[in-house]
Every structure is written in C-alpha cells, then in structure tokens.
C-alpha cells in the first residue's frame, strides 16, 4: 500500500490511507473542518458595507476603479517573475518553429500529424510572437533577449511530447507566481497570455492521442521549479541579459518509466514505425493509462554543484538535508510518499493512490505532474507552494500519468 500524506485544501482531511510517520498536518480551514477561524469578512451574501464605489459594484476588490493602470513591474519580484515568463515564451517560439522544420511532411504524416495539425502548431508559434511582445513591453527596454537552445528529441512523437511538457511547466510556473505579483495590471495581461498557453498544452495532448484534460484543477509550481526545468535547454544568451535570481535544483531522473516502455517513446505508446497507437483525436479514453497508482517508481538524482543554463553560468544547489520523501505536486495537492534509498543518489518511491477530495473519483496524480525529493513533509497549499523550495533535494521531474 502506498503510504502518503496529502496537504490539501480539504481541511484536516488525510486523503491517503497509511499516513507516514513524520507528521505534516494539513492546514485547517473553517467551514470545511478543523478549528474555527475568525474571518474579517462575514460571508453571508448580505452586504457588509452599504456604500458602493460605483453603480452595481460591491465594495472591495483591488484597483477596481483604477483609471490609468500601469502595466509594468512594481518590484524585483515582478521583474524576475515576468523575465522568467519571457524566457519561456522565447523557447516556445523557437521550439514550435524548430520542430516543424526538423521533420519532413512525410515524417509528420507517418506519425499521424497531417497538414491541418501542422498548421495548428505553426499558429502556436505565431501566438508566441504576441506573447513575447506583450511581456517585453511590460518589462521595458531592459527586457531579456532571445537565447539559443538545444533539444534532445529525434522523432515527431518525442517533439510533440516535449512541446506538451514544456507548455505545461511554463503554464504551471506562471500559475505559481501570478497571485503574488505586486503589479496587478501586469498580472491581468499575463493571465490572458497564459490561458492561451493552456489551450496549446491541451491541443498538444490531443495530438498525442491523450485525454485532453484529465484533471479537475491545473497545477501551480514555484519559479525555481520552472527555471530548473528550462535551464538545461538554454545554451547561451546575449551578454546584456541579466542573470535570473531563481534557484537551479539538482536534476531528478526517472529510471523506471511509466507503464508503456516497449515503444519508441515511453511517454506515450507508439507502434515501431512511429505512428500512434492512439491517433490524434479530440478525446481518447485510454484502456491502459500511462501509469498506475501504487506502481514502483525508481529515481536517480544529481549531486549539487553542476553548471547548467545559459553559458553554463548557473550552478545547481540545495539547502535541504537527506531526502526522505517524494513530493508529488498535482492539482491542489502536494502528496508525500516515502522514499527508500537504494544507493548513491538513487531510490524508490511509489505513485500515490490518493484522491483529490474524500470519496471523489479524481485521482490526485493525473495528467502532467511534478515530482521533487524533499527532506521534510511540510504542509503547503497552492498559494504558498514556494515554501517547499528550502526542502527540495532534487527535481522537479515531470511525470506523466492518467
């Protein structure tokens, strides 16, 4: 049985059976469970304030009557976060165009990606032009410039898979910091950009023959998770680009891949000739999932101190101790499963079988998930997910399930 503890929005609810020994009690929320909490606002539906700031506009909200919004960073946090988003827009533009030129029409056709689907990918690249201009304009004249990149895919299927993975962690990275931006106007524009990217990721899943969105909620991750994932694919950047502040964690590797391993790309099943066992479709209800709850997951991880990123100018680091748990970050939850050390920087854990809410049908681990190794199982929720950073030993690893 998988032993796990999920720190979730279900106050006080231990969503998996067989709780690990190290206590990490979930946060309690009044009205859902746990101790009562005194809120400053009484949520009854009746007006707490009789005076409205404008017609048909209840009191409250942030900058709702701002007549001249400022779409610009208000802090170092804003600048560094928006710059990270821009780095992702640049690589996505490069990736979509590179993939379309690397493979011939015949190779795409053989993999089930016909001319209509290729045009969709081409339009995704065009969307990135708008996203790049948007974020660059908000950052101003000192915004980072485009870099040079490297990719390790060699088939159409692995190109689509990497594009789906990249757009997912880019999307999740923005969800992680968006609520914390000081510039609410900049956050509003970035939201309109990242929701477009969410549609890209869904379409790429459909091109893989995957179920388009097998989750109830999308996942948010810290900036350092997104930066750790993108940095290895950046070869070099212009000298005028200032270094980003975000941490690069040691890499985490999947030794035993998900269920489908006897095909050319273990991330999703293919026939030996590269065509999809499940062809591109609006929706595909798979008989066999990519991975299963309770299955063993073998991992290996790098030691800190490795040079990564643009011009190898960033060094991986961690402030954590010995890894004790695998933290599975998916949807609203962080679920901790025990890690059994099997060797030097290697170990085994299990895919948790917990559910999003008690008695719900939604498995927590579904779709594209993020896995990190930690030294302590601390309770975190989507709004304070960054608190996990100081406990990360290695990761994140992008883990496909469902």
Swiss-Prot record:
Transmembrane feature ranges: none
Induction summary: When cells are starved for glucose, ammonium, or phosphate, when they are exposed to a carbon dioxide atmosphere, when they are shifted to higher temperatures or when they enter stationary phase. Adenine-repressible.
Pfam families: Ferritin_2 (PF13668)
InterPro entries xref list: Rds1
Superkingdom classification of source: Eukaryota
Gene Ontology CC: endoplasmic reticulum
Job description of the protein: May have a function in stress-related responses of the cell.
Protein known as: Protein rds1
């Amino acid at each position: 049985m998988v032993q796990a503890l999920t720190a979730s929005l279900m106050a006080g609810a231990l969503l998996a059976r067989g709780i690990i020994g190290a206590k990490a009690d979930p946060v309690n929320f009044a009205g859902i469970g746990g101790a009562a909490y005194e809120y400053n606002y009484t949520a009854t539906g009746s007006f707490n304030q009789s005076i409205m700031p404008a017609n048909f506009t209840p009191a409250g909200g942030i900058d709702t009557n701002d007549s001249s919004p400022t779409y610009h960073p208000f802090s170092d946090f804003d600048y560094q976060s928006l710059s990270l988003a821009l780095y992702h827009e640049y690589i996505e533009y490069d990736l979509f165009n590179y993939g379309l030129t690397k493979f011939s029409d015949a190779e795409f056709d053989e993999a089930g990606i016909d001319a209509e689907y290729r045009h969709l990918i081409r339009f995704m690249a065009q969307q990135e032009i708008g996203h790049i201009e948007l974020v660059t304009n908000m950052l101003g004249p000192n915004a980072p410039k485009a870099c040079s990149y490297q990719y390790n895919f060699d088939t159409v299927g692995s190109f689509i898979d990497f594009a789906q993975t990249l757009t997912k962690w880019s999307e999740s990275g923005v969800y992680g910091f968006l609520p914390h931006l000081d510039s609410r106007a900049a956050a509003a524009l970035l939201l309109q950009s990242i929701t477009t990217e969410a549609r890209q990721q869904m379409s790429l899943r459909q091109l893989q023959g995957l179920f388009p969105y097998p989750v109830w909620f999308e996942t948010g991750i810290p900036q350092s998770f997104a930066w750790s994932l993108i940095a290895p694919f950046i070869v070099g950047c212009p000298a005028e680009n200032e270094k980003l502040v975000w941490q690069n964690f040691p890499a985490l590797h999947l030794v035993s891949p998900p269920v489908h391993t006897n095909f050319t790309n273990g991330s999703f099943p293919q026939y030996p000739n590269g065509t999809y066992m499940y062809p591109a479709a609006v929706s595909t209800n798979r008989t066999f999932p990519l991975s299963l709850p309770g299955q063993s997951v073998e991992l290996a991880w790098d030691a800190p101190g490795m040079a990564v990123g643009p011009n190898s100018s960033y060094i991986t680091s961690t402030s954590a101790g010995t890894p004790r748990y695998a933290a599975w970050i998916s949807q609203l939850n962080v679920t901790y499963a025990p890690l059994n050390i099997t060797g030097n920087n290697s170990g085994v854990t299990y895919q948790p079988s917990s559910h999003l809410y008690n008695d719900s049908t939604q498995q927590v681990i579904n779709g594209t998930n993020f896995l990190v190794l930690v030294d302590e199982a601390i309770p975190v929720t989507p709004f304070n997910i960054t608190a996990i950073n100081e406990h990360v030993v290695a990761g994140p690893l992008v883990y496909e399930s469902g």
